[in-house]
From Swiss-Prot:
Species assigned in the record: Staphylococcus aureus (strain MRSA252)
Gene it is expressed from: vraB
Matching Pfam families: Thiolase_C, Thiolase_N
GO MF annotation list: acetyl-CoA C-acyltransferase activity
Protein name (record): Putative acetyl-CoA C-acetyltransferase VraB
Active site: C86, H338
Family statement drawn from the similarity comment of this UniProt entry: Belongs to the thiolase-like superfamily. Thiolase family.
PANTHER family, A to Z: 3-KETOACYL-COA THIOLASE, PEROXISOMAL, ACETYL-COA C-ACETYLTRANSFERASE YHFS-RELATED
One GO CC term on file: cytoplasm
PROSITE patterns, per the entry: THIOLASE_2
């Protein structure tokens, strides 16, 4: 079987919903990343077999194809857009790696993009052309049958209740995320991931959701979103805009083209869970991944689990017995933000830049009761 390696990875800084990036459509968010790869790796770009991108709330069509054309890549390069909800970016990376393993191609660009600010509104189609009632807007997408389709906040509350994750534990984890993120921004670790871009004449190179300092006591001052609950705005992620691209190729070709370090894709798993508990998906996904590769949690140096809500990450940490020295060691989405279809690719990008780590897992909890996870080693 061929081996797939990730040899380059970059992302935009993530903008807040309605923030600096609010005027940019998904293909415009991707354009500077494509152009960066085109300028830095011209010989490789000419060999691309496909572009695979995750996207969740875009305006339809095939964003991967449209974006590569907008960026001036060759007409002969195809593109495919994947929607596995919040797991889309990680799914796209796995898809590209699997295609290489199968011998279907040798060079891929994978990643994800999201503009929550530009997400279109959707209305229900009338049953008859003669209806006079005002159009009814969809509040959100439906992930499962009505009786098992909680909002993401309710899903986080369900996980917190089922797994005994207290408000205090959730706030403590959120504080940790902000502290670790701030520390790794300051020491330059996170800046390695980011390609600075110019927006309306201004340089944009820092995640817009970041808070320079939040006193620990502040987390306890927020009221629960749902009365009687434990999930608050402070222990939940923000909605964000941003894009991520990774260059993935067959290992022998990577060496031939002068690449000598990066991530080696070992395996990936996607599972289903109770759709009322969407955030718990990483538990069986990671468990299955470890079992299939005859590993234990102790064999993994770093585990990145997307921080949609403190409740679900803490529940996963406890269920899998992950230590604090393994979990989200540079912080996470509670501080940096969550651009849905790009977040899984961002986790892999983060692992790419942890040059001193040898064994790593990225995992996402996904709306509708899903979880995915991917295993990487250094090459």
């Amino acid at each position: 079987m061929n081996q797939a390696v990730i040899v380059a990875a970059k992302r935009t800084a993530f903008g807040k919903y309605g923030g600096t990036l609010k005027h940019l459509e998904p293909e415009q968010l991707l354009k500077p990343l494509f152009q960066h790869f085109k300028e830095k790796y011209p010989e490789v770009i000419s060999k691309i077999d496909d572009v695979v991108l995750g996207n969740v709330v875009g305006n339809g069509g095939n964003i991967a194809r449209k974006a590569l054309l907008e960026a001036g890549l060759k007409d002969s390069i195809p593109g495919v857009t994947i929607d596995r909800q919040c797991g889309s970016g990680l799914e796209s990376v796995q898809y590209a790696c699997r295609m290489i393993q199968a011998g279907a191609g040798k060079v891929y660009i994978a990643g994800g993009v999201e503009s929550t600010s530009r997400a279109p509104w959707k209305i229900k189609r009338p049953h008859s052309v003669y209806e006079t009632a005002l159009p009814e807007f969809y509040e959100r997408a439906s992930f499962a049958p009505e009786m098992s389709d909680p909002s993401m906040i309710q899903g986080a509350e369900n996980v917190a209740k089922m797994y005994g994750v207290s408000r205090e534990l959730q706030d403590e984890f959120a504080y940790r995320s902000h502290q670790l993120t701030a520390e790794n921004v300051k020491n330059g670790n996170i800046s390695q991931e980011i390609l600075p871009i110019t927006v309306k004449g201004e340089l944009f190179n820092t995640d817009e959701s970041l808070k320079s300092h939040i006193p620990k006591d502040n987390f306890g001052r927020f009221k629960p979103v749902i009365k009687g609950g434990t999930v608050t705005a402070a222990n939940s992620c923000m909605k964000n805009d941003g894009a991520v691209l990774l260059l993935i190729m067959e290992k022998d070709m990577a060496y031939e083209l002068g690449f000598d370090h990066g991530l080696l894709f070992k395996d990936g798993v996607t599972v289903g869970v109770d759709s009322n508990l969407p955030g718990i998906g990483p538990v069986p996904a990671i468990s299955n991944l470890l079992k299939r590769n005859q590993l234990t949690i102790e064999n993994i140096e770093v585990i990145e689990i997307n921080e949609a809500f403190s409740a679900q990450v803490v529940a996963c940490q406890q269920a899998l017995n992950i230590s604090n020295t393994q979990l989200n060691i540079w912080g996470g989405a509670l501080a940096s933000g969550h651009p849905y279809g790009a977040s899984g690719a961002q986790l892999v990008t983060r692992l790419f830049y942890m040059f001193d780590k040898e064994s790593m897992i990225a995992s996402m909890g996904i709306g509708g009761g899903l979880g995915n996870a991917a295993l990487f080693t250094r090459f």
